[in-house]
Design a protein with these regions (language model features):
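C-terminal motif of bacterial Sec signal peptides marking the signal peptidase cleavage site
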Residues: 30-32
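N-terminal secretory signal peptides that target proteins for export/translocation
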Residues: 1-17
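Sec-dependent signal peptide recognition
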Residues: 18-24
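Solvent-exposed loop/turn segments at secondary-structure junctions
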Residues: 81-85, 105-109, 134-138, 173-177, ...
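Charged, glycine-enriched surface loops/patches
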Residues: 145-170, 197-207
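Catalytic His-Asp segment of secreted/periplasmic serine-dependent ester chemistry enzymes
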Residues: 173-256
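Serine-esterase "nucleophile elbow" of acetyl-processing enzymes
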Residues: 37-127
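Active-site segments of SGNH/GDSL-like serine hydrolases
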Residues: 131-137, 158-191
Length: 256
């Protein structure tokens, strides 16, 4: 009987010690992960890192230079990879004009909203061209309703207007699918839905609506292949696609 009692008591004590041991291991692992994140950059979809979700650091140094060299005709292009890639296909479009490219690949509207002040407002431009929303539809930083995407763009617009900056809101370019997010369905319909919200907002608030969509649509909701994009891409313009966009936006900015 004594042996049985001792055995049972030892087992219960051992179980209790095991629980403490497991808890200690879990806490140690969590602390190790936090320490590792401090030393190693962890990149996230949407163009940032865990330590800089909106990628505020990308243009920080360049912004300092522009603040010290203000241009009363400056126009900032705010956007994602479609805007950022513009400078790669035709750098002269920005070099030969008072245009500043503030596109960041992969970004969504909440990320842009966070960096809107340092990357746009602080540069004191006369106007801002906002092209955003396609990565939100792709779910780059998680699911989001179409109306919430639009509201983020409206917020950027209202911040600009409050700072006496003229606003040009661009339609989202046509797209039928996302090669990096093939599970997203009805892409072209979602693009059209977002564009309708943007267009209505512009009409109601006397803001210029820049319609890239209608001139680049292949008739089935996608970019024209091979005229404006490649069959392996379907989302980003090629050189000729950017030329079309330049012709459209310059009609709005000619008076600047």
């Amino acid at each position: 009987m004594l042996k049985k009692i001792f055995s049972n008591g030892f087992t219960q004590k051992q179980k209790k010690m095991n629980k403490y041991l497991i808890l200690t291991v879990i806490i140690f692992n969590l602390l190790s992960c936090n320490s590792e994140n401090k030393n190693n950059t962890v990149f996230i979809q949407g163009g940032g890192t865990l330590n800089d979700w909106a990628n505020l650091s990308k243009y920080a140094e360049s912004n300092k230079e522009l603040i010290d060299d203000l241009d009363e005709n400056r126009v900032v292009f705010m956007g994602n990879s479609i805007t950022e890639g513009w400078s790669n296909f035709n750098p002269d479009f920005f070099i030969n004009n008072p245009f500043v490219n503030r596109g960041i690949s992969g970004q969504t509207t909440p990320q842009m909203l966070i960096r809107f002040k340092p990357d746009v407002i602080n540069l004191k431009p006369t106007a801002v061209v906002i092209l955003a929303g396609i990565n939100d539809i792709a779910g780059n930083t998680g699911p989001i309703k179409i109306e919430n995407i639009a509201e983020n763009i409206f917020s950027m617009s209202e911040i600009a207007l409050a700072n006496n900056i003229e606003v040009f809101i661009c339609s989202v370019l046509p797209a039928k699918a996302f090669p990096w997010s093939p599970s997203i369905k009805n892409v072209s319909k979602k693009v059209i839905e977002l564009n309708l919200l943007l267009k209505d907002y512009c009409l109601e608030n006397n803001i210029q609506y820049v319609d890239y969509h209608s001139v680049m649509d292949d008739g089935n909701g996608g970019l024209k292949v091979p005229e404006h994009t490649t069959e392996n891409d379907l989302v980003h313009p090629n050189k000729d696609g950017y030329k079309v966009m330049e012709g459209v936006i310059l009609n709005f900015l000619a008076f600047k």
